[in-house]
Amino acid sequence: MDNTDEPQKKVFKARKTMRASDRQQLEAVYKAKEDLLKTTEVKLLNGKHENGDSDLNSPLSNTDCTEDKREVNGLVDSNEISEIKRPESRAESVVSDLEPKPLSPVNVTREQDTDVALVCEAENRVLGSNKVNFHEENNIKNRLDQRESDTPSGENKSNCDNSFSPEEKGKTNDITIISNSPVEEKKKAGEIIVEDTVGEEAISSSMETDQEPKNERDGTAGLSETVVEKAVDESSESILENTDSMEADEIIPILEKLAPAEDEMSCFSKSALLPVDDTAPDLEEKMDNCLSSPLKQESNESLPKEAFLVLSDEEDPCDEREHAEVILPNKSGLPEEVEKSEEEDKEREVVHKEEEKHTERGEVSRRKRSKSEDMDSVHSKRRRFVGEEDYEAEFQVKITARRDVDQKLEKVIQRVLEEKLAALQCAVFDKTLADLKMRIEKVECNKRHKTVLTELQAKITRLTKRFGAAKEDMKKKQENTPNPSLSSGKAASSTANANNLTYRNITTVRQMLESKRNVGDSKPATLQAPVSAAPASSLAAPQTPASGHPKPQTPVTSSPLTTTVISTANTATVVGTSQVPSGSTQPMSVSLQSLPVILHVPVAVSSQPQLLQGHAGTLVTNQQSGSVEFISVQSSSTVGSLTKTAVSLASTNTTKPNNSPSVSSPGVQRNSPASAGSVRTTLAVQAVSTTHPVAQTTRTSLPTVGTSGLHNSTSSRGPIHMKIPLSAFNSTAPTEPPTITAPRVENQTSRPPTDSSANKRTAEGPTQSVKVTGSDSGGVIDLTLDDEDDVSSQAEAKKQNQTASTAQSIPTQPLSRPLPPLQPNPLQQTGVPTSGPSQTTIHVLPTAPTTVNVTHRPVTQTAAKLPIPRTPTNHQVVYTTIPAPPAQNSVRGAVMPSPSLRPVNPQTGSMTVRMPQTTAYVVNNGLTLGSGAPQLTVHHRPPQVHAEPPRPVHPAPLPEAPQPPRLPPEAANTSLPQKPQLKLARVQSQNGIVLSWSVIEVDRSCASVDSYHLYAYHEDPSATMPSQWKKIGEVKALPLPMACTLTQFVSGSKYYFAVRAKDIYGRFGPFCDPQSTDVISSQSS
């Protein structure tokens, strides 16, 4: 009691922690003690606190309820007397609250309530000491001690768990938030607890609280003791929790100052400090404020001011909230409990005062908190803590208990505060860690996205460069090839092929596509336009004239063809021109016009050029282009153009020897119009017939041509042939032509299956599919026809270089990159009879066969042979041997009758276009090859490479090693230098290639190496000669592995590198396997 008096006299204020609002609240509380008592009306919280029983609000509500009940029951007197009794009942309710609360935020609130109850119990004990409660106080102390252990573990846990919960509750309950003036509320709570021990019970159950307050008031000592004991136990627990959460530093000094009531103060401060206490005060205050300021006022009045310890740590609102949200509330709670314990006697007065203060203060806090904490709602306190808000802990510690009790309480409070603080710190740390993890995850996710974007952009850039380079190469090759083609009729055909090749080469896939687009729009019209017009439009001027008469121009046309491939109209023109040179018939140009359509379909520029060129003069080209293209032709517009073209071609063709096929073609072509394939086929046939009659005779395209009707069928069969071409194509030209023709058409449709597979094999799959006929045909054709002999592909590539030389070359290059893999297929396919066809078989073959078959039945047969024997095929073999292109043709062309073949090629071109395989042959042989070859060539180029020693054609044979003049005797005991293993890598800057070489195992029997000689080979669509291997450097031997970096390359080109060792005796070791790299791409093959 004395102790209580002392604490009443002392008001401790923490400088920092005291909020302005808290001070105001304190002042208001002091001023409005009586008013606070009046606030009993705020029983509204009873409902809340009843609900609050289950939830956070319940503690607050209960507290308020208790207060309300106190006020109702006779706030001041009742509070004083009831405080003793009520503390018991309240403690009981608090106990019940506390027990359930630990599980949930409500637990925290309940803990707070419990703390309050404990305070009440402490007060009750004080009163009990005065009355009978003193004995109870001892019991309470004992229980507090017990509960200290229990509560710390249980409630502290709940505090830890609910470390947010007390504050959350406080926050949740604006009332709790009001706890900002925890001191007031604590005092209030103390008094409320004392008075409203019943009230706390009310917290458990408002009804109970009401009854209990009265009962407890009536049942003084007994209930008090029991309740007080329970309350003390619970308060100990709360206190422990609060102590944990509360900062011991703050609490201890205050407790020490409050030494007289240290025990109760300890309990109280602990509870106050504990989140529970804070929550309890907050809850009580808030509940009081929310339920009824009067209750709080009552509570405050009831609570003696004696040990009004105000820890303004911003327990509720601020600092401690952040760090020890729970702790601060506990702090306030503990002080309250301590207060309550101390205050028992004077708590009534203090409680009244405090209640007033709390009410005012609670109201003020409440406002503050409601605004700040309302956001979080009733749970805002805890959430706030979670939200890292600052908490103010106000501790009103009124210790009315004896010193021994005070000491015990102080210890309990310290322990509880420590535990609570630890819990709060853990919670803060966990939350911070979780936030950090989230941020890290976001950052990593962003990094991944950026990386993916960067990679995609880099790939796009590389592809763009590659296409640009391929385009340039194709243009250069085209320019180069046209000249040769101009050289002679054969040359012209060759040129046409070369042009086609060049065109192809020039037209990288991209160019082809672009051209195609251009052509696509203009193509139908262009095609429809007179063949001459189409050629004219195509490269139009040159081609038209070429188309008109000059086969030499045809080469040009070829180029245009290539161009045409690029643009539909051009394609047509080109084809026409090419064919003119090939067939040396304008019909061819007409075919070309048709071709454009076909070419257009092929989309694959390279194949189109090939097709165009292959068809150069005829629908064949279209067909060839079009296996897929053909389909395009078959498309109504395409058909229309084709039809017109076909007719024109037919007439033109008719004029020409091949005209017979042409004538048939016309009819057929008309049919073709219906089926673009037909027209193309016809054209191709015609062209083939015309030119090929001679050249293609071999082909027997003529038979096909002869079978103009066949052609029609061919066009329709084109697809069939396509499929057949692979097999049939190889098997029978004559039959195939028609088949091919039909297949051709199918080719476009069907050919996707056959040709398309081949085509797809060819790099362009889909595009090629479309252009498969053309593209695959071209490539395949070249390959197939050419490759029909294995080399054929490669040869074909070269042939294409000749025929499609330009066109093919370009396509080859462009395609070559993509196609390399395909080319192998073609090669392999080549191996296979259907290889060509397979190539798509080169759709061209099927198409060509169709066209060629129609035009060149022989060709088809040849094609058939070629596919099977590919090499066996005369033309194909020839083609295989040499790319159709004149230049390459020379090599391969040599095999093929360059002149006739070339002419055939033009025709074949048409035919070739028609039948991918035949075309392939044709292409291989001549322009057709080129036309067909363009794409195929591209596809086949790698095969070509393979054809050459290391690679078909391309890596040309490596130069022979010169023999040293004479060897010293010691050299006889040593073997030649070992064969190095070469690896290529790209420098990130994209402007350098790193060559690194080593040996798998060091052979001791070899003489020491003096130097390494580096050779480079620039892939050229023209004939591949060993002389093309150039020595680029000599490096003094160093311990392996060695490496050097080469720079200054022509972008878009393909380079092959080889290394060989020279020993100290001047002997050269074997070359390493040549390695190639595409300067456009960052990959080395």
Swiss-Prot record:
Residues 82-91, 133-150, 347-379, 469-479 have a biased composition (Basic and acidic residues). SUPFAM superfamilies: Fibronectin type III (SSF49265). GO terms for biological process: DNA methylation-dependent constitutive heterochromatin formation; regulation of DNA-templated transcription. Keywords: Activator, Coiled coil, Nucleus, Repressor, Transcription, Transcription regulation. Residues 54-64, 151-165, 173-182, 667-717, 746-775, 792-810, 830-843 have a biased composition (Polar residues). InterPro entries: ATF7-int (IPR026085), ATF7IP_BD (IPR031870), Fn3_ATF7IP (IPR056565), FN3_dom (IPR003961), FN3_sf (IPR036116), Ig-like_fold (IPR013783). Residues 976-1082 form the Fibronectin type-III domain. This is Activating transcription factor 7-interacting protein 1. The gene is ATF7IP.
